[in-house]
């Protein structure tokens, strides 16, 4: 038995195709996560995983369960969807659930970046305003590269300039322009600063 809990992100941020798992189950689940064709695997500390989630409950009962998250809430991204579908067929093939047709021989999957919580930087709004991104999508970034600005909407002045604190990869990017103090703007994998 195996469970894959598939989510889009919320309506506020865009997520690179990723698999999330609890560090308590990482040794057992990481090999499965690598089969899912995700760009990113994020291993959370036990403290950040809610006891009431499907993944927590099933893993606690011994059913291997992963959470796949991608895109933006209430939207379908064809490229991300196809990427995950390929990963699901690869996982099913490796679990002996599905046999790859001989003509295809093998499903090519990406080697994901594996991250722990200590390697993720959360960039948040210091003031309320309008977030205007400087980058179009998630991906590689260098320390000091612009991620975006928060604009004061009445006067149009920049009240916060957001730069990457590390060389790494942006795997979460603000999608909804309206931000309040403390709102998540981006997550960057690449180590703590």
Over which residues does each language-model region extend?
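Structured catalytic-domain cores with a bias toward divalent-metal coordination
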Residues: 1-193
């Amino acid at each position: 038995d195996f469970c894959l809990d598939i989510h889009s992100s919320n309506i506020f941020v865009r997520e690179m195709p990723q698999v999330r798992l609890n560090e308590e189950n990482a040794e057992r689940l990481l090999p499965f996560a690598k089969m899912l064709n995700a760009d990113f695997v994020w291993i959370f500390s036990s403290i950040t995983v809610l006891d009431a989630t499907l993944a927590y409950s099933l893993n606690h009962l011994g059913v291997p369960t992963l959470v796949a998250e991608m895109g933006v809430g209430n939207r379908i991204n064809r490229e991300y969807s196809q990427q995950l579908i390929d990963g699901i067929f690869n996982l099913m093939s490796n679990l002996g659930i599905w046999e790859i047709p001989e003509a295809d021989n093998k499903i090519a999957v990406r080697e994901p970046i594996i991250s722990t919580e200590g390697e993720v930087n959360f960039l948040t709004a210091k003031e309320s305003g309008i977030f205007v991104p400087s980058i179009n999508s998630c991906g590689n970034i260098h320390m000091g590269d612009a991620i975006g600005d928060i604009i004061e909407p009445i006067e149009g002045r920049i009240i916060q300039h957001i730069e990457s604190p590390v060389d790494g990869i942006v795997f979460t990017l603000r999608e909804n322009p309206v931000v309040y103090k403390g709102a998540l703007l981006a997550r960057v994998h690449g180590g703590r600063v």
